[in-house]
């Protein structure tokens, strides 16, 4: 296993409440913001977090391996200033067969995403997906250290799956819209229609009821 060169984040970003400007990435799926000069490289044998093999202040898809001749780590920044995303993309990584994952840093929100993107039907990743602050503080996705892929083999984003990490204290009541599931093209003569969608609960309290408003073509909210 090896580390990449030190890379610069192309916008202001805070990790665990503190500003960070640079990172490096291991060929075993670990991105670290600290001790950039000479940290030991984590091996491909992943484990539950926290783990002493992982440097402080790290994000990881630990357990994938950049051992193939066409296994690469690519970076690209998307969006406009103020709301950009910086993607660190593990392409064609080895996990039984080819496997694609990304770590994403988001400007403005300081959110971190781990994106499960695309896999061969023969791939069998068993990864630790999460964040380690130090030797005693870490969080990992349920299922780690044997977290399997959810995304299929499509090169399109339609079957991608992601895990979102938000800094701060969890609100008791919080929700976000995921999708509008009503068919986008409707014949008015067939009205009335049922407006449907999906929401996700981001709060600690169970949601038992809510008010939902919507507008059509910029009209008054209903």
Q: Which positions does each model-derived feature cover?
A:
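Extracytoplasmic Ser/Thr/Pro-rich, glycosylation-prone low-complexity segments
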Residues: 1-173
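Extracellular/luminal regions of secreted and cell-surface proteins that mediate adhesion/ECM remodeling
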Residues: 169-222
């Amino acid at each position: 296993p090896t580390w990449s060169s030190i890379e610069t984040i192309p916008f202001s970003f805070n990790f665990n409440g503190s500003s960070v400007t640079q990172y490096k990435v291991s060929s075993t799926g670990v991105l670290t913001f600290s001790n950039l000069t000479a940290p030991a490289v984590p091996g491909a044998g992943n484990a539950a977090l926290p783990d002493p093999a992982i440097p402080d202040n790290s994000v990881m898809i630990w357990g994938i391996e950049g051992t193939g001749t066409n296994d690469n780590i690519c970076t690209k920044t998307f969006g406009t200033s103020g709301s950009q995303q910086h993607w660190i993309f593990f392409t064609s990584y080895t996990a039984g067969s080819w496997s694609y994952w990304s770590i994403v840093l988001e400007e403005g929100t300081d959110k971190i995403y781990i994106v499960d993107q695309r896999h061969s039907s023969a791939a069998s990743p068993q990864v630790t997906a999460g964040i380690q602050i130090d030797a005693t503080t870490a969080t990992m996705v349920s299922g780690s250290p044997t977290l399997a892929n959810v995304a299929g083999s499509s090169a399109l984003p339609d079957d991608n799956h992601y895990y979102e990490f938000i800094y701060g204290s969890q609100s008791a009541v919080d929700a976000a819209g995921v999708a509008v599931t009503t068919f986008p093209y409707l014949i008015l003569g067939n009205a009335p229609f049922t407006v449907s969608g999906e929401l996700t609960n981001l709060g600690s309290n169970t949601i038992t009821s809510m008010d939902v408003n919507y507008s059509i073509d910029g009209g008054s909210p209903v």
